[in-house]
Amino acid sequence: MDINWVEIQKSQICNNDDAILYNEIVACYKNKLYRSGYLLAWILLIESLKRKIIELASLDDSRGKTEWQLIEQMEQNHQSTDCQITLSAKECEIISDTEFTTINSLWQQRCIFAHPYMQEVKVSDLEYIISKLVDITLSKPLSLSKKMIEERLDEIVNSPHVIPVNPDEQNNFIKQQLVLIKEKHYPVLYKNLFFYLSKAREANNNTIAAFMRRYI
């Protein structure tokens, strides 16, 4: 057991809301309640991914909205959504294929550990899921992949009604997008912005052209 280690993991958490449940996991860890800690860690993993899907949907992302509607419908029907949330997170590129495989492995262990007479939960089991929980989602803010950046701009161009009319609202709209784009993806962003600006000028589409200039 390494108390300092779990505290270091906590320092990597991006969202303060996640820290609340993480503190309960730490309490389980300190008190050697490894089974309870494991199950709480699984819950936090799923809830963190779910929040990112909702966040993506709130930004009018088509895949985010589709996946969230599916999850929401399952919740309304009182169905288990853990596996669907994981799959939806992969579909929205919130997690990679490798991370999806890791989460499936954690899910299988969670199902075993949920039955107290089947297998003892060791400190190493709890440490493992905590490390993956932090690596896969808690330490990562929601961000857009290259493909998602291209899709977002394509959606804006083909559905210009989503562009706010007020210039200040346009600025806020753009800031919401930029927060989700990593610096390493800026070249992809600007390449697409200049491409759509050129096309808008050729088509005399002043609305799109003005928006692209503001974005740039």
Write out the residue ranges for each language-model feature.
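A broadly used, surface-exposed interaction patch
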Residues: W5-I8, N15, I53-Q108
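Charged alpha-helical initiation segments
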Residues: M1-S36, L40, M148-E169
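Charge-enriched, short contiguous segments at helix-coil
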Residues: C92-M148
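Polyanionic, low-complexity intrinsically disordered segments
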Residues: D135-I216
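Amphipathic alpha-helical scaffolding segments
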Residues: W42-E47, D61-G64, E127-V134
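Hydrophobic alpha-helical packing segments in soluble, helical-rich domains
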Residues: Y38-E55
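Generic structural signal for well-ordered, non-membrane alpha-helices
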Residues: N23, E47, Q108-I112
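Short, charged/polar micro-motifs that form catalytic or ligand-binding hotspots
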Residues: S11, N15, A27-L39, I43, ...
